[in-house]
């Protein structure tokens, strides 16, 4: 198989020129892909990219599940991430491409909060799959961005374009939360896998002074991006990975305390705590009782 070249695009103007689009603003563009002239190669953009595809939602590379909508699919790319060619072209025959340079959002609320839109760090197969109503709202937001781009550039342009983009991303945050809900059964399976993974982590003594496995460690074994794993765990349990792991540690400690042969200091050591005091504080915080008190009440 011949490996397709990757075209590095550093500016919005280069992006417009490459796809046959007129540049309306040097730091942002919204392109109708049905009218674009896409070269047969992969792209690596030096700016944020949002791709809404109206066709090809069956493509398994975007990770659509049986319980997902199929009105449209959206993927989000941070600066420097490549969008790979599928077949002959990297983009579908219909859809929209929104691109905005980091310089556009400097000093804006979007610039200060861009890290909260964690889906820019998701894998392509963790894409957002829209219902028809959600698709209409996303397209409406992109049309509003396009309308502002067509306005003559003035001192209000930067803030207004940024606000329109921020509104689109806020809707996408809502839609991702909805997708977590409709993927409830799939998410339960991932949580069960996470529980088994953490139980094995504890059983094999891997903590060894490390109080918590990282999101990178767990997500790699679950074949997820670290940020998607973090967001899924937070949505389903309300906990971050280190908080969830502490619950698992205390759960395991509670079982070990049922045996009088297990000394509290030995339990703390086996579970990877630096000392008994650290273990006892956490155990009391979660259960409301000190380890020895817990042992007495349970026996």
Description of each model-found segment:
Residues 69-83, 99-102:
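Conserved metal-binding segment of the jelly-roll/cupin
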Residues 88-153:
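A hydrophobic/aromatic-rich effector-binding and dimerization subdomain
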Residues 136-199:
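An amphipathic alpha-helical interaction segment
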Residues 72, 217-224, 229, 233, ...:
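Append "Primarily bacterial transcriptional regulators
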Residues 280-299:
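…primarily DNA-binding HTH/wHTH and HhH modules…
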Residues 162, 184-222, 243-262:
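A short, Lys/Arg-enriched amphipathic alpha-helix from helix-turn-helix/homeodomain DNA-binding modules
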